[in-house]
């Protein structure tokens, strides 16, 4: 596996919390600031959960997507259509699995991807444990809406 940053740098591609279970977008601050968007993965009664089921974010703006894994197990995160439609600027904290089109978030870790968000639309995402199939409780949508002007 190659690092996601290396893949992005090589390709320059435009090619996928308010508390542990909520996503939150915060208005950008001064010039150069990015809007943070968080997806939280946690284990509840032995079952993996990812929140929120629907995260709203502005279209065609700089964002920092953070995937926060508060569980004791590694969690894979995939949002291939979202990442393919976005312009990735930089990333950190993970290795991109090119063959599987996902990255893994280590236990009790946070990874981030800074990007220019795509055009408005609904983009499916999923969190899942290695070897498992995503379920309704581990999947959701990144809802990209026209940016407020």
Question: Model-found features: residue ranges?
Answer:
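Bacterial N-terminal signal peptides
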Residues: 9-18
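Short aromatic-acidic-glycine turn motif
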Residues: 83-92
């Amino acid at each position: 596996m190659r690092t996601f940053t290396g893949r992005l740098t090589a390709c320059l591609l435009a090619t996928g919390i308010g508390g542990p279970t909520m996503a939150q977008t915060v208005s950008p601050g001064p010039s150069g600031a990015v809007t943070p968007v968080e997806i939280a993965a946690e284990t509840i009664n032995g079952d993996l959960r990812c929140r929120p089921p629907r995260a709203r974010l502005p279209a065609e703006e700089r964002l920092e997507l953070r995937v926060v894994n508060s569980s004791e197990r590694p969690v894979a995160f995939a949002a291939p259509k979202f990442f393919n439609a976005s312009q990735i600027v930089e990333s950190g904290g993970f290795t991109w699995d090119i063959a599987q089109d996902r990255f893994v978030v280590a236990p009790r870790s946070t990874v981030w991807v800074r990007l220019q968000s795509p055009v408005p639309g609904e983009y499916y995402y999923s969190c899942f444990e290695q070897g498992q199939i995503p379920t309704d409780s581990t999947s959701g949508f990144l809802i990209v809406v026209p940016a407020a002007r």
